[in-house]
């Protein structure tokens, strides 16, 4: 029986792996629209952005709560780092469109890269987000881990994250692109203020991000 069960489980594993790979590949070729409770429909275009969104390193953020243990006090705070990353991506898309409308020159490659940078900005978070950050790896901040994971993904993706990493590290000549990712008024903050406010019911963070 043990031998039969082992063969069955092995075949099941292979089948499920092939099934999800086909589904993932099909999604990457067609893109995806996600309905977000904070911002509404978010369009995930096919190509490198979809590859990053569906990558296992990114998908693990589904299981990491944005506010750690805050749900013990605010039961509605069940939202995840994955949701936050998509929200920040949406705001980055809006910001790029707004800047272009004001005459700021941003190439398609730069626009794609800065969207990738904001998508991956929190990929280094561990269990319970900030709660265990200094316990699991003392002296190492999640931004450093995010960069390490981005570099690993970049190797897997044949260097297609090169510009995104340069923007993330503030090594690209158009420094305002980095400021959209990390500054006193970036897409990260604009999303988590609204998102945390929405899910906790605390109105103080409900700012007008569209402005």
Kindly give the residue locations of the regions a language model identified.
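Polybasic, lysine-rich low-complexity intrinsically disordered segments
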Residues: 1, 5, 22-25
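Short hydrophobic targeting helices and cationic amphipathic motifs
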Residues: 6-9, 16-20
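Sequence-structural signature of the catalytic-core scaffold of metal-dependent phosphohydrolases
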Residues: 15, 25-65, 72-116, 124-211
């Amino acid at each position: 029986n043990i031998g039969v069960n082992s063969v069955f489980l092995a075949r099941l594993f292979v089948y499920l792996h092939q099934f999800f790979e086909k589904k993932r590949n099909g999604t990457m070729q067609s893109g995806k629209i996600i309905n977000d409770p904070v911002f509404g429909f978010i369009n995930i275009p096919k190509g490198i952005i979809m590859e990053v969104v569906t990558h296992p390193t990114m998908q693990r953020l589904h299981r990491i709560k944005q506010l750690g243990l805050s749900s013990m006090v605010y039961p509605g705070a069940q939202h995840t780092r994955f949701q936050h990353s998509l929200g920040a991506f949406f705001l980055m898309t809006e910001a790029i469109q707004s800047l272009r409308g004001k005459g700021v020159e941003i190439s398609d490659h730069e626009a794609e890269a800065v969207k990738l940078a904001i998508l991956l900005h929190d990929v280094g978070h561990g269990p319970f987000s900030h709660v265990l950050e200094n316990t699991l790896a003392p002296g190492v901040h999640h931004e450093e881990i995010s960069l390490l994971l981005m570099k690993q993904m970049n190797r897997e993706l044949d260097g297609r994250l090169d510009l995104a990493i340069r923007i993330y590290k503030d090594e690209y000549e158009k420094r305002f692109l980095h400021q959209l990712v990390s500054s006193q008024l970036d897409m990260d903050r604009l999303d988590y203020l609204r998102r945390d406010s929405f899910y906790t019911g605390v109105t103080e963070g409900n700012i007008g991000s569209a402005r």
